[in-house]
Amino acid sequence: MAIVIVGAGTAGVNAAFWLRQYGYKGGIRLLSRESVTPYQRPPLSKAFLTSETAESAIPLKPESFYTNNNISISLNTQIVSIDVGRKVVAAKDGEEYAYEKLILATGASARRLTCEGSELSGVCYLRSMEDAKNLRRKLVESASVVVLGGGVIGLEVASAAVGIGRRVTVIEAAPRVMARVVTPAAANLVRARLEAEGVGFKLNAKLTSIKGRNGHVNQCVLESGEKIQADLIIVGIGAIPELELATEAALEVSNGVVVDDQMRTSDTSIYAI
C-alpha cells in the first residue's frame, strides 16, 4: 500500500517532496494525466509562448529527483473514479491503484466561454503545456489577437503576443485591468506599460458573440455593437476547481473540497490540497 497523489502539479509534487523530507518511508505514487514530467505553469504565459528554448527551464524537479526519492510517477494516467470502500482509484485505461492514504491535488481547469461562436477554431485556452504549444503555433499564423480577460494571465499573454509583432486587443468587463488582485494605481501602471508596447484595451466591455468564416474565428462582437477583428482569441476569464472525483466519491464539497486544518476531507483517508 502507498500514498497515492492524484495530480502532479506544484501541489502534488511538493506533497511528495515533503513526505520524504519529513521521513515518510512508504511508497509514494504520483499520477499525472499529462504526457510530460511535472512542470511549472507560470512560465507558460510568458517566454514559453514565443520561444521553444524556454521549455528546458520549466521542470518542477529534475527527473533524478523522483528516482533518488523513490517516488513513482505515472504519466498519461487520467483518474476517473475513487472507490472509497476498496481504497482504490481507477484510471481511464482501466488500471487501478490501491492507496493507504490518497491526496487529491487536481487543481483547476480554465473557465470556458459559452457565448455564440465559442466553439469555433481559433478560440484558445491556456492551462497546460499542450495548450501553450498549440497557442505558440497559432500565434505564428495570426495577425490580430484578442485576449478576453484582463487578469494576470491575460495580460502576460498580451505582452508576449505584442512582443512578436501581433496586433493585440484586451477585452475586460471591469472598469480596469487586474481588478481583483492589485490596487487601481498599480493596475493603471500595468495598463500604461502595455499600451506603450502597443496593446489596445476595451474596458467595461462585454463579449456577446464570436463570428467566424469557414469554421474559424474572424470577429468579436461586443455588447455595444462594436466589432473587433480577430484571427485568434485567447480566453483568460478565470478557473474552476476540479471537483468531479471528489463529488463522485461523495466527499463534502463547497466551491472546492472541504477540508479540516490538516487538509483531511470528509473521508479521513483522503486529503485535498
For each feature predicted by the language model, list its residue ranges:
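A conserved short coil-to-beta-strand element within the FAD-binding core of flavoproteins
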Residues: N76-K87, L203-H216
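Glycine-rich dinucleotide-binding loop and its adjacent helix/turn
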Residues: T106-I164, V259-D261
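Rossmann-like dinucleotide-binding cores of NAD(P)H-dependent redox enzymes
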Residues: S45, I58-P59, S144, I153-S209
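FAD-site-proximal beta/loop scaffold in flavoenzymes
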Residues: E119-V140, N214-V221, E226-I273
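Beta1-alpha1 glycine-rich phosphate/pyrophosphate-binding loop at the start
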Residues: M1-S72, A160-V182
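Redox-cofactor binding/interface segments in oxidoreductases and associated redox assembly factors
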Residues: A91, L104-A105, V147, L222, ...
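Residue-level detector of alpha-helix initiation sites
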Residues: G9-V13, S35, A108-A110, E130, ...
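Short hydrophobic core segments
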Residues: V6, Y97-G107, I228-G238
